Amino acid sequence: MWTNLLKKHRSKLDMSSVDLDGSHTRATKGGESIGYQGRKKSKTTNALYLTDRQGLPLTMSVPVSGEHNDLYRIKRSTDEIFGTLEEAVIPVDGLFLNADAGFDSEDFRNQCLSHGVFPNVCFNKRNGGYDRNELLIDELYRKRYIIERTNAWMDSFRSVLVIHDTTLTSWEAWNYIVFAVLLLRNIKHSLVKITSIKRTTKNTELTEKQFIPYFP
């Protein structure tokens, strides 16, 4: 369902660049791909999320248990993410992708490049200094805050704020339902804005016609 919806409305997306981020979600019960995450001091699942420049969620990786970091099985995760875009007839070749320092690894960069994607990854201090040959466009990276806003949007939906399901497919389905709601909400807002502009333009034209001076 989600891939078809994404394909149908792909013209509404802003693919000038995309953002990638990992997100841990707490689980109230046990279940598939659930594990203890020390930083959150609770059981979580971890998934990677990709958004467009507007912050609209595009796809996610198959979640893994919470004890794993964002680079766990990164080849599989990137193949899943870029594969979904390709299924939706959204070209990935030439995309610029922002990611935080947690993705600063040779494997991740190589995986992106193998799909034709340019990784704009913040340098991790533990991997050395900033005088490196890898790509990092600061001006582009500063736009990454938008995916943090998307995380806040997602958290406003109780169905994905905390995991109550025990099956992985159910949890993924809830995420894609939220993706669809956010996309359709954005489309509706855009249509309302366009209609408002057209009405304003039409009213302005009528007003101008009413006040056109007549010179006999």
Located regions from the model:
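Short alpha-helical elements
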Residues: M1-P216
